Amino acid sequence: MKTRLFLTIAIGALASFSLNGRGEELTATPANTSGEPATNAPMFQKLADAKWNKILPDLGDNSPEICILRVDPKTQATSLLIRTPKAIHVRKHWHTANETHTIIVGTASFACDGKRIELGPGSFNFMPAKMVHEAWLPANSLTFITVDGAWDVNWVEGPPTSADLSRAF
């Protein structure tokens, strides 16, 4: 019975997300809302079995996709993946919590605080909470992200649109 509960919680950690308002804030929500006690059991997830959701549904098949890997039930710290079917400029935004990016596939460009840098596979960066930043992600990129609190996106000038697709670095 405990194994079944652990598996249910582990699978449920591929949480859904909700778009609040007019897409100005994106928030990850934990899947375990059943009132069951949280667990510290190990969790394993194969990329091939990941559940992906569109971040910007208005962009249709061109939308970047998100896979919430795990949300800590106590702190709401979140581990997630983002992949991009098309190159996209992710407009200026900020997060309530500290955020890290590790590039798995592709070479992304990040800008913040008057600086811009390209990061390739294996590269890492840290964005302090509420630091306004933007990114240019290539087609078919994959980025691993951790957030030390609940994951959200607060757009400075609105979310990306079709005009931001395939925008050059």
Q: Positions of the model-derived regions?
A:
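Double-stranded beta-helix
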Residues: 41-46, 134-169
